[in-house]
Protein backbone atom coordinates (compact mmCIF):
# COMPACT_ATOMS: atom_id res chain seq x y z
CA UNK A 1 0.00 0.00 0.00
CA UNK A 2 2.82 2.41 0.86
CA UNK A 3 4.41 1.75 -2.54
CA UNK A 4 1.15 2.69 -4.22
CA UNK A 5 0.99 5.98 -2.31
CA UNK A 6 4.64 6.74 -3.14
CA UNK A 7 3.93 6.12 -6.82
CA UNK A 8 0.86 8.38 -6.67
CA UNK A 9 2.81 11.17 -4.95
CA UNK A 10 5.61 11.05 -7.53
CA UNK A 11 3.11 11.04 -10.36
CA UNK A 12 1.17 14.07 -9.09
CA UNK A 13 4.43 15.95 -8.41
CA UNK A 14 5.58 15.44 -12.01
CA UNK A 15 5.10 18.60 -14.09
CA UNK A 16 4.51 16.63 -17.33
CA UNK A 17 1.72 14.68 -15.63
CA UNK A 18 0.20 17.94 -14.35
CA UNK A 19 0.20 19.40 -17.86
CA UNK A 20 -1.39 16.24 -19.27
CA UNK A 21 -4.13 16.20 -16.61
CA UNK A 22 -4.98 19.83 -17.40
CA UNK A 23 -6.00 18.75 -20.92
CA UNK A 24 -8.36 15.92 -19.90
CA UNK A 25 -11.87 17.27 -19.07
CA UNK A 26 -12.73 15.04 -16.09
CA UNK A 27 -9.27 15.19 -14.54
CA UNK A 28 -9.01 18.91 -15.31
CA UNK A 29 -11.90 19.62 -12.91
CA UNK A 30 -10.08 17.80 -10.12
CA UNK A 31 -6.81 19.58 -10.91
CA UNK A 32 -8.52 22.98 -10.91
CA UNK A 33 -10.16 22.29 -7.56
CA UNK A 34 -6.85 21.32 -5.97
CA UNK A 35 -5.08 24.29 -7.53
CA UNK A 36 -7.72 26.60 -6.05
CA UNK A 37 -7.37 24.95 -2.65
CA UNK A 38 -3.60 25.36 -2.71
CA UNK A 39 -3.91 28.99 -3.78
CA UNK A 40 -6.28 29.70 -0.89
CA UNK A 41 -3.77 28.19 1.55
CA UNK A 42 -1.03 30.36 0.06
CA UNK A 43 -3.18 33.51 0.03
CA UNK A 44 -4.76 33.00 3.44
CA UNK A 45 -2.74 35.74 5.14
CA UNK A 46 -3.73 38.26 2.47
CA UNK A 47 -7.39 37.35 2.94
CA UNK A 48 -7.04 37.84 6.69
CA UNK A 49 -5.60 41.32 6.17
CA UNK A 50 -8.48 42.27 3.87
CA UNK A 51 -10.84 41.18 6.64
CA UNK A 52 -8.87 43.16 9.24
CA UNK A 53 -8.98 46.30 7.08
CA UNK A 54 -12.77 45.96 6.77
CA UNK A 55 -13.07 45.54 10.53
CA UNK A 56 -10.94 48.58 11.29
CA UNK A 57 -12.95 50.70 8.87
CA UNK A 58 -16.15 49.43 10.52
CA UNK A 59 -17.41 48.51 7.05
CA UNK A 60 -19.85 45.81 8.06
CA UNK A 61 -21.63 48.03 10.55
CA UNK A 62 -21.73 50.88 8.03
CA UNK A 63 -23.59 48.55 5.64
CA UNK A 64 -25.95 46.95 8.15
CA UNK A 65 -28.89 49.16 7.12
CA UNK A 66 -28.43 48.60 3.40
CA UNK A 67 -25.97 48.87 0.50
CA UNK A 68 -24.04 52.07 -0.17
CA UNK A 69 -22.24 53.63 -3.10
CA UNK A 70 -18.48 53.92 -3.24
CA UNK A 71 -18.75 57.65 -2.57
CA UNK A 72 -20.96 57.12 0.49
CA UNK A 73 -18.57 54.54 1.92
CA UNK A 74 -15.65 56.88 1.23
CA UNK A 75 -17.32 59.61 3.27
CA UNK A 76 -17.78 57.21 6.20
CA UNK A 77 -14.34 55.59 6.10
CA UNK A 78 -12.01 58.40 5.14
CA UNK A 79 -9.91 56.44 2.65
CA UNK A 80 -9.08 57.78 -0.78
CA UNK A 81 -11.35 56.44 -3.51
CA UNK A 82 -8.80 54.31 -5.41
CA UNK A 83 -7.47 52.24 -2.48
CA UNK A 84 -10.98 51.99 -1.01
CA UNK A 85 -12.29 50.60 -4.31
CA UNK A 86 -9.45 48.08 -4.31
CA UNK A 87 -10.36 46.97 -0.79
CA UNK A 88 -14.07 46.72 -1.61
CA UNK A 89 -13.40 44.66 -4.74
CA UNK A 90 -11.12 42.38 -2.74
CA UNK A 91 -13.78 41.97 -0.04
CA UNK A 92 -16.35 41.10 -2.71
CA UNK A 93 -14.03 38.43 -4.13
CA UNK A 94 -13.89 36.59 -0.78
CA UNK A 95 -17.62 36.98 -0.03
CA UNK A 96 -17.28 39.59 2.69
CA UNK A 97 -19.24 42.04 0.53
CA UNK A 98 -21.51 41.83 -2.51
CA UNK A 99 -22.14 44.08 -5.50
CA UNK A 100 -25.77 45.18 -5.49
CA UNK A 101 -27.86 47.20 -7.95
CA UNK A 102 -26.56 50.56 -9.17
CA UNK A 103 -23.00 49.52 -8.31
CA UNK A 104 -23.66 49.70 -4.59
CA UNK A 105 -21.82 47.53 -2.09
CA UNK A 106 -23.74 45.40 0.40
CA UNK A 107 -22.98 42.75 3.00
CA UNK A 108 -21.74 39.42 1.69
CA UNK A 109 -22.57 36.01 3.12
CA UNK A 110 -19.40 36.05 5.22
CA UNK A 111 -19.58 39.72 6.14
CA UNK A 112 -23.16 39.76 7.44
CA UNK A 113 -22.39 37.60 10.53
CA UNK A 114 -19.78 40.18 11.57
CA UNK A 115 -22.27 43.02 12.04
CA UNK A 116 -22.03 44.11 15.69
CA UNK A 117 -20.38 40.77 16.48
CA UNK A 118 -17.97 41.85 19.21
CA UNK A 119 -16.82 38.28 19.88
CA UNK A 120 -15.53 37.61 16.37
CA UNK A 121 -14.23 41.14 15.92
CA UNK A 122 -12.16 40.82 19.10
CA UNK A 123 -10.55 37.61 17.85
CA UNK A 124 -9.83 39.09 14.42
CA UNK A 125 -8.08 42.06 16.02
CA UNK A 126 -6.22 39.72 18.40
CA UNK A 127 -4.68 37.85 15.48
CA UNK A 128 -2.29 40.74 14.88
CA UNK A 129 -0.46 39.51 18.01
CA UNK A 130 -0.41 35.92 16.74
CA UNK A 131 0.93 36.88 13.31
CA UNK A 132 3.95 38.58 14.89
CA UNK A 133 4.98 35.24 16.37
CA UNK A 134 4.29 33.38 13.11
CA UNK A 135 6.49 35.69 11.04
CA UNK A 136 9.26 33.06 10.98
CA UNK A 137 7.55 29.67 11.42
CA UNK A 138 10.80 27.68 11.52
CA UNK A 139 12.15 29.88 14.30
CA UNK A 140 8.94 29.21 16.23
CA UNK A 141 9.06 25.47 15.54
CA UNK A 142 12.69 25.27 16.64
CA UNK A 143 11.81 26.75 20.02
CA UNK A 144 14.33 29.55 19.51
CA UNK A 145 11.85 32.42 19.18
CA UNK A 146 12.44 34.87 22.02
CA UNK A 147 10.05 37.42 23.51
CA UNK A 148 6.93 35.87 22.00
CA UNK A 149 4.04 38.31 21.83
CA UNK A 150 1.40 35.73 22.70
CA UNK A 151 3.32 34.51 25.72
CA UNK A 152 3.37 38.05 27.06
CA UNK A 153 -0.32 38.51 26.28
CA UNK A 154 -1.20 35.38 28.30
CA UNK A 155 0.98 35.81 31.42
CA UNK A 156 -0.28 32.68 33.16
CA UNK A 157 1.62 30.46 30.69
CA UNK A 158 4.95 32.03 31.62
CA UNK A 159 7.34 30.39 34.08
CA UNK A 160 8.89 33.76 34.87
CA UNK A 161 8.43 34.54 38.58
CA UNK A 162 7.69 38.19 37.85
CA UNK A 163 4.95 37.22 35.40
CA UNK A 164 3.48 34.78 37.92
CA UNK A 165 3.43 37.43 40.63
CA UNK A 166 1.72 39.85 38.23
CA UNK A 167 -1.32 37.54 38.07
CA UNK A 168 -2.50 39.15 41.30
CA UNK A 169 -2.57 42.54 39.54
CA UNK A 170 -5.89 43.45 37.90
CA UNK A 171 -4.20 45.71 35.35
CA UNK A 172 -1.88 42.90 34.22
CA UNK A 173 -4.64 40.35 33.66
CA UNK A 174 -7.26 42.74 32.30
CA UNK A 175 -6.14 42.55 28.66
CA UNK A 176 -6.43 38.81 28.22
CA UNK A 177 -9.41 38.54 30.59
CA UNK A 178 -11.34 41.12 28.58
CA UNK A 179 -10.60 39.21 25.36
CA UNK A 180 -11.81 35.97 26.93
CA UNK A 181 -15.01 37.63 28.14
CA UNK A 182 -15.71 39.34 24.83
CA UNK A 183 -15.10 36.23 22.73
CA UNK A 184 -16.80 33.75 25.08
CA UNK A 185 -20.29 34.01 23.50
CA UNK A 186 -18.86 32.02 20.56
CA UNK A 187 -18.70 29.05 22.95
CA UNK A 188 -21.19 29.87 25.71
CA UNK A 189 -24.25 29.85 23.46
CA UNK A 190 -23.28 26.41 22.12
CA UNK A 191 -22.87 24.99 25.62
CA UNK A 192 -26.16 26.36 26.95
CA UNK A 193 -27.96 24.97 23.89
CA UNK A 194 -26.33 21.57 24.43
CA UNK A 195 -27.09 21.07 28.12
CA UNK A 196 -29.88 21.72 30.62
CA UNK A 197 -28.22 23.29 33.66
CA UNK A 198 -31.49 23.47 35.61
CA UNK A 199 -31.11 19.83 36.69
CA UNK A 200 -28.28 20.91 39.00
CA UNK A 201 -28.21 22.75 42.32
CA UNK A 202 -24.83 24.52 42.17
CA UNK A 203 -22.37 25.24 39.35
CA UNK A 204 -18.67 26.00 39.81
CA UNK A 205 -17.00 27.50 36.73
CA UNK A 206 -13.26 26.86 36.99
CA UNK A 207 -11.16 29.34 35.05
CA UNK A 208 -14.39 31.30 34.64
CA UNK A 209 -12.81 34.69 34.04
CA UNK A 210 -15.12 37.62 34.62
CA UNK A 211 -18.21 35.44 34.93
CA UNK A 212 -19.48 35.80 31.37
CA UNK A 213 -20.41 32.12 31.13
CA UNK A 214 -22.14 32.11 34.53
CA UNK A 215 -24.21 35.11 33.46
CA UNK A 216 -25.26 33.28 30.28
CA UNK A 217 -26.23 30.14 32.21
CA UNK A 218 -28.32 32.26 34.59
CA UNK A 219 -30.60 33.24 31.69
CA UNK A 220 -31.42 29.54 31.17
CA UNK A 221 -31.42 28.41 34.81
CA UNK A 222 -32.05 31.37 37.15
CA UNK A 223 -32.34 29.20 40.29
CA UNK A 224 -28.90 27.65 39.91
CA UNK A 225 -26.33 28.65 42.54
CA UNK A 226 -23.14 29.92 40.91
CA UNK A 227 -19.49 29.94 41.97
CA UNK A 228 -16.41 31.14 40.10
CA UNK A 229 -12.76 30.15 40.55
CA UNK A 230 -9.89 31.90 38.78
CA UNK A 231 -6.64 33.75 39.39
CA UNK A 232 -6.77 36.45 42.09
CA UNK A 233 -6.45 39.39 39.71
CA UNK A 234 -9.17 37.99 37.45
CA UNK A 235 -11.72 37.32 40.18
CA UNK A 236 -11.16 40.82 41.55
CA UNK A 237 -12.16 42.16 38.13
CA UNK A 238 -15.17 39.84 38.14
CA UNK A 239 -16.28 40.95 41.61
CA UNK A 240 -16.16 44.59 40.51
CA UNK A 241 -18.25 43.81 37.43
CA UNK A 242 -20.81 41.89 39.47
CA UNK A 243 -21.57 45.03 41.50
CA UNK A 244 -23.33 46.49 38.46
CA UNK A 245 -26.07 43.83 38.53
CA UNK A 246 -27.89 42.69 41.65
CA UNK A 247 -28.45 39.18 40.24
CA UNK A 248 -24.71 38.75 39.61
CA UNK A 249 -23.88 39.73 43.18
CA UNK A 250 -25.03 36.27 44.28
CA UNK A 251 -22.07 34.69 42.45
CA UNK A 252 -19.45 33.52 44.94
CA UNK A 253 -15.90 34.20 43.77
CA UNK A 254 -12.74 32.32 44.79
CA UNK A 255 -9.23 33.36 43.84
CA UNK A 256 -6.35 30.94 43.56
CA UNK A 257 -4.23 28.70 41.34
CA UNK A 258 -6.13 25.59 40.30
CA UNK A 259 -2.87 23.66 39.94
CA UNK A 260 -1.88 24.35 43.55
CA UNK A 261 -4.99 25.25 45.54
CA UNK A 262 -8.02 23.14 46.48
CA UNK A 263 -11.21 24.00 44.65
CA UNK A 264 -14.23 25.07 46.70
CA UNK A 265 -16.66 22.27 47.53
CA UNK A 266 -20.44 22.34 47.26
CA UNK A 267 -21.02 22.20 43.50
CA UNK A 268 -22.66 19.21 41.83
CA UNK A 269 -21.56 20.49 38.41
CA UNK A 270 -18.18 21.94 37.43
CA UNK A 271 -17.44 23.49 34.06
CA UNK A 272 -14.18 23.98 32.15
CA UNK A 273 -14.87 26.34 29.27
CA UNK A 274 -11.88 26.79 26.96
CA UNK A 275 -9.44 25.83 29.72
CA UNK A 276 -7.59 22.56 29.30
CA UNK A 277 -6.23 23.10 25.78
CA UNK A 278 -4.04 25.83 27.31
CA UNK A 279 -2.10 23.28 29.36
CA UNK A 280 0.09 20.20 28.98
CA UNK A 281 -1.10 16.71 29.90
CA UNK A 282 0.46 16.62 33.37
CA UNK A 283 -1.14 19.90 34.37
CA UNK A 284 -4.48 18.77 32.98
CA UNK A 285 -4.28 15.60 35.09
CA UNK A 286 -3.62 17.71 38.20
CA UNK A 287 -6.63 19.89 37.41
CA UNK A 288 -8.92 16.94 36.67
CA UNK A 289 -7.88 15.23 39.92
CA UNK A 290 -8.70 18.39 41.85
CA UNK A 291 -12.11 18.61 40.18
CA UNK A 292 -12.83 14.93 40.83
CA UNK A 293 -12.00 15.51 44.50
CA UNK A 294 -14.29 18.57 44.72
CA UNK A 295 -17.33 16.85 43.18
CA UNK A 296 -19.73 14.58 45.09
CA UNK A 297 -20.51 11.06 43.96
CA UNK A 298 -22.64 11.37 40.84
CA UNK A 299 -21.37 14.89 40.20
CA UNK A 300 -20.77 16.10 36.67
CA UNK A 301 -17.90 17.79 34.83
CA UNK A 302 -18.68 19.60 31.58
CA UNK A 303 -15.76 20.38 29.26
CA UNK A 304 -16.26 22.66 26.26
CA UNK A 305 -13.56 23.88 23.91
CA UNK A 306 -12.37 23.57 20.30
CA UNK A 307 -10.93 20.10 19.78
CA UNK A 308 -8.59 18.46 17.31
CA UNK A 309 -9.99 16.38 14.44
CA UNK A 310 -13.39 18.00 14.76
CA UNK A 311 -15.74 16.52 12.12
CA UNK A 312 -16.05 18.76 9.05
CA UNK A 313 -13.40 21.17 10.41
CA UNK A 314 -10.08 19.25 10.59
CA UNK A 315 -7.77 22.28 10.00
CA UNK A 316 -9.22 24.11 13.01
CA UNK A 317 -7.59 21.81 15.56
CA UNK A 318 -4.08 20.79 14.55
CA UNK A 319 -3.43 23.68 12.14
CA UNK A 320 -4.99 26.77 13.73
CA UNK A 321 -4.99 25.94 17.44
CA UNK A 322 -1.87 23.80 17.15
CA UNK A 323 0.20 26.74 15.95
CA UNK A 324 -1.61 29.26 18.14
CA UNK A 325 -0.86 27.29 21.30
CA UNK A 326 2.71 26.65 20.20
CA UNK A 327 3.20 30.40 19.86
CA UNK A 328 1.50 30.90 23.19
CA UNK A 329 4.02 28.56 24.77
CA UNK A 330 1.84 25.93 26.39
CA UNK A 331 -0.93 23.45 25.68
CA UNK A 332 -2.17 21.65 22.59
CA UNK A 333 -5.47 20.85 20.88
CA UNK A 334 -6.75 17.41 21.86
CA UNK A 335 -9.16 14.98 20.30
CA UNK A 336 -12.26 13.80 22.14
CA UNK A 337 -10.48 10.48 22.70
CA UNK A 338 -7.40 12.13 24.22
CA UNK A 339 -9.46 14.21 26.64
CA UNK A 340 -11.52 11.16 27.56
CA UNK A 341 -8.35 9.17 28.26
CA UNK A 342 -7.04 11.87 30.63
CA UNK A 343 -10.39 12.02 32.43
CA UNK A 344 -10.70 8.25 32.79
CA UNK A 345 -7.17 8.15 34.17
CA UNK A 346 -8.20 10.21 37.22
CA UNK A 347 -11.47 8.37 37.85
CA UNK A 348 -14.20 9.95 35.72
CA UNK A 349 -16.62 7.69 33.86
CA UNK A 350 -19.68 7.73 31.60
CA UNK A 351 -18.24 10.24 29.15
CA UNK A 352 -20.87 11.58 26.75
CA UNK A 353 -20.40 13.78 23.69
CA UNK A 354 -23.20 16.35 23.66
CA UNK A 355 -24.59 17.79 20.45
CA UNK A 356 -23.02 21.08 19.40
CA UNK A 357 -24.60 23.19 16.68
CA UNK A 358 -21.21 24.71 15.82
CA UNK A 359 -18.45 22.24 16.72
CA UNK A 360 -15.89 24.57 15.12
CA UNK A 361 -16.45 26.83 18.15
CA UNK A 362 -16.55 24.05 20.71
CA UNK A 363 -17.30 20.40 21.26
CA UNK A 364 -18.98 19.57 24.56
CA UNK A 365 -18.18 16.58 26.80
CA UNK A 366 -20.08 15.54 29.93
CA UNK A 367 -18.33 13.34 32.49
CA UNK A 368 -19.54 11.71 35.71
CA UNK A 369 -17.75 10.90 38.96
Where are these regions (language model features)?
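Eukaryotic partner-binding/assembly regions in large regulatory complexes
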Residues: 1-16
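C-terminal alpha-helical "lid/dimerization" subdomain adjacent to the S-adenosyl-L-methionine
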Residues: 302-346, 352
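Core SAM-dependent methyltransferase catalytic element
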Residues: 347-369
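Conserved beta-strand edge residues that scaffold enzyme active sites
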Residues: 104-106, 309, 357-358
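Conserved Class I S-adenosyl-L-methionine-dependent methyltransferase catalytic core
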Residues: 17, 21-201
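Conserved adenosyl
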Residues: 116-313, 350, 360-363
